[in-house]
Amino acid sequence: LGETRLCYTADHPAYSSLVCRLYRGDLRLPVEEKMQSLMRLASFAIFGQDRSTRVCGDDGSLCRDTAIEVWRENQRSTEDWHDHSEACEFTTFHAYEYTLADQASNLHRNVIFKSSTVPQAPLSAKDAPTPEQLWGWLDDTCIEGNDSCDVLAIPHNSNWSSGRMWFPYTNQDLSLQEQQRLAALRARLEPLAEMMQVKGDSECRNGIASVIGAPDELCDFEKLRPPSEIIPDCG
């Protein structure tokens, strides 16, 4: 939230930075036209997992402080548009996206709060670069830390996760007891998963290595990668 706001603030020093110019689309990358908008969204990830010092300052505080301002604006808009009357014709939720990208894998979560009781600021993937850190923060800050706060995180766009959305790749060196604790925590915080959105279906995939049985003829619907694309069997 902080980076994007600063990149659109014309009188801020970050406005003319390379990463902000890429993000706004002022510069074009040497990729095909349909990929330009995607590369804009990925511009901050292109420059690494850490916050850009050119945009956020040496300690990242510019982006964190700005994110708090934007988060408050979002909360006001959420409350303004929510129908608090008995008619309940329109419902809004306080929410944000935890936009983690690791090794070119999309590990995004939509973080949705149950009520207007929310943390002071959203936790960025720049400050918590593993899903386990997000779960721990949501549990400590919201669920266990405030009786009036409740939240869930919805994994989305897992069709771009290279399978890492469902593989506990950061837990391999942990004790069995700790792995069980994290699995239970995830089950509590992530009871849902997104199946479909504009960037394709995430429910299933034909052509996965070592799968027993014939391809599912209903599994080629709205795939990000065309069903005709040959997938190498890395089994």
Feature annotation, model-predicted:
Residues 1-235:
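Extended, charged catalytic domains and RNA/DNA-binding interfaces, predominantly
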